[in-house]
A protein has these predicted regions:
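Hydrophobic transmembrane architecture of multi-pass small-molecule transporters
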Residues: 2, 415-504, 510-513, 522-524
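Transmembrane core module of solute transporters
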Residues: 19-79, 83, 113-114, 174, ...
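Structural signature of transmembrane alpha-helices in multi-pass secondary transporters
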Residues: 35, 64-67, 71, 98, ...
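Small-residue (Gly/Pro/Ala) motifs that create kinks and tight helix-helix packing interfaces
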Residues: 46, 158-170, 334, 422-430
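Cytoplasmic loop-to-transmembrane helix junctions
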Residues: 59, 143-150, 315, 403-410, ...
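Helix-loop-helix hairpins in multi-pass membrane proteins, especially solute transporters
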Residues: 75-214
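Small-residue-rich alpha-helical segments with characteristic i,i+4
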Residues: 160-161, 373-457
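C-terminal membrane-cytosol helix-exit motif in multi-pass small-molecule transporters
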Residues: 184-202, 220-232, 250-264, 508-515
């Protein structure tokens, strides 16, 4: 076989069809949004699922984590399987498996069956998002900024809108409707993709020889163990529990083994060598910081509003809805703005906006109004939109076309790992940070502190108007202790938001490591 013929085999050939590329993009985005909503919508209906099956909250949490684990395990296989079957055909297979998984969730008679169904659904949903990214880059090869803006609609909007739609369906009908709506929409997606997306030929000559079962087992064990540690760590007091230490060690060893194996194996399940592209390596790392800022605040803001201000879960969900709207609007306009402004400058502006928003969140207190919470959230999500499009375009700018599927899978996997660790770390930071503040403040609740005596006496006189003196004294002391707990939590949130703001500022100089070839390409 000639060298030119071998090169042609490496490239995926696409059959040309006269279909509007914007219509094709919308068709590809629909199942991607469904896969992401399936992950975040169940967060809201978790208590309903626990009550329906008579399970505890920790047991019902496995409904969420089982889907995430299956997603994480399948992500690295995207590039290999896309080349083996062809992107379009593999995309259809993923949607079919995802749809069947949703149907199995409806048929579940107990919690264990539901968890198995969610694993099946997660296997289908795991590769949908990176495939969407790779296919959008194929549809718009000369408009990578616009392609990444469309991809951002699914990647950013769906997780933010998912809790709202999940809560709406659960409150008005039942938790089963979170899965019911997936089925007709998946069937519509399958039909539209079948007829509107051009078929690409699989590269079977290279990729049907051997399936890298050892590499797949390595990443499966690594991702599974990591998610178990992140999910159960807080419940079992993290590394004070021996089995948590063992599972963490297995996860780290499996990641290292996977990396070394994929570099040496002749037919790797995922091409680790794409990280040799400096733009992809640095761009993926910086994109992960955006995910940390977005998803950490997505966890912290509802937690702040519920634990410190007393909002209900539904009210906290409504606080998050404007974030989704701003993200959607920002991503749509940034696709065009990215053509006019240098990508690194635009990304830096986005991080400055995010840092300002996190600083505003750190200034919130227990008397904060709804508007004072919503406005920093809107600013944060606008900053995410500003930075997401150019940094995503820069990440894939210097990669050859036949590497986009591998790169998209690795890009999604890396961000998935960082996001999982950061959200778990944020939750632990609030719990442990509150304890540190409480230990420091409790020293001041002593009789030798004159301010303590003044406040205690004032509260006692207030309660003595309603209760006997002994009861009034206990209620006064209890009220002061509750205020101490409240201030301890507030201090932890203050520190968390400040650290996020600092992270957004520190990452800006690293943008200089990225190469921007936009001007040179236009000149040529």
């Amino acid at each position: 076989m000639k060298t030119s013929e071998i090169t042609e085999i490496e490239e995926t050939t696409v059959t040309k069809k006269q279909v509007n590329p914007y219509i094709q993009a919308m068709v590809i985005l629909l199942p991607s949004i469904l896969a992401l909503v399936a992950s975040s919508a169940t967060n809201v209906c978790q208590p309903n699922i626990a009550g329906y099956f008579g399970a505890t909250q920790y047991e019902a949490n496995s409904v969420i984590t089982s889907y995430i684990i299956a997603n994480g395990i399948m992500l690295p296989t995207t590039g290999y399987l896309a080349k083996l079957f062809g992107k379009k055909q593999f995309f259809l297979y993923c949607i079919i498996v995802f749809c069947i998984g949703a149907g199995l969730c409806l048929l579940a008679k107990d919690l264990h069956m539901l968890i198995m169904a969610r694993i099946f659904q997660g296997i289908g949903g795991g590769c949908i998002l990176p495939l969407c990214q790779a296919m959008l880059l194929d549809i718009f090869p000369n408009k990578k900024g616009f392609a990444m803006a469309l991809y951002g609609v699914a990647a950013m909007f769906a997780p933010l809108a998912g809790p709202f739609f999940g809560g709406y369906l659960t409150d008005n009908w039942s938790w089963q409707w979170v899965f019911i709506v997936n089925i007709p929409l998946c069937l519509i997606s399958i039909a539209l993709i079948k007829f509107l997306i051009p078929k690409d030929e699989p590269v079977k000559e290279k990729y049907n020889k051997k399936f890298d079962i050892i590499g797949f087992a390595g990443i499966a064990v690594a991702m599974g163990c990591m998610q178990i540690v992140l999910d159960k760590g807080e419940q079992f007091n993290w590394f004070d529990t021996p089995w948590i230490c063992w599972v963490t060690g297995i996860s780290i060893f499996s990641f290292i083994f996977f990396y070394v194996w994929e570099l040496e194996y002749k037919y790797p399940i995922i091409d680790i060598r794409v990280f040799k592209d400096k733009n992809f390596l640095y761009g993926t790392s910086i994109s992960s910081i955006i995910n940390i800022l977005l998803y950490s605040t997505l966890l912290l803001v509802p937690l702040f509003s519920q634990s410190l201000i007393g909002y209900s879960p539904s009210a906290s969900g409504l606080l998050m809805l404007p974030r989704a709207m701003v993200c959607l609007f920002g991503l749509l306009i940034m696709g065009e703005i990215a053509k006019l402004v240098e990508n690194r400058l635009l990304t830096a502006i986005g991080f400055i906006i995010m840092a300002a928003a996190c600083f505003m969140l750190s200034c919130l207190n227990t008397t904060a109004s709804m508007h004072s919470i919503i406005i920093p959230n809107l600013i944060l999500c606008f900053g995410v939109s500003v930075a997401f499009v150019p940094i995503s375009a820069l990440s894939f700018l210097t990669l050859p076309a036949n590497k986009t599927a591998d790169a998209a899978g690795l890009h999604a996997l890396f961000k998935n790992i960082v996001t999982a660790i950061s959200t778990s770390a944020a939750s632990t930071f609030i719990a442990r940070g509150g304890q540190v503040y409480q230990n420091n403040l409790v020293e001041h609740l002593a009789w030798h502190n004159p301010m303590y005596r003044v406040h205690l006496n004032a509260l006692q006189h207030k309660f003595m108007m309603m209760y006997p003196s002994v009861v009034a004294q206990k209620k006064a002391a209890g009220t002061l202790y509750k205020q101490l707990i409240l201030q301890s939590k507030l201090g932890a949130f203050y520190d968390a938001f400040l650290w996020l703001a600092l992270m957004a500022i520190v990452v800006i100089p690293f943008l200089l490591l990225l190469k921007n070839k936009t001007k040179r390409i236009k000149a040529n």
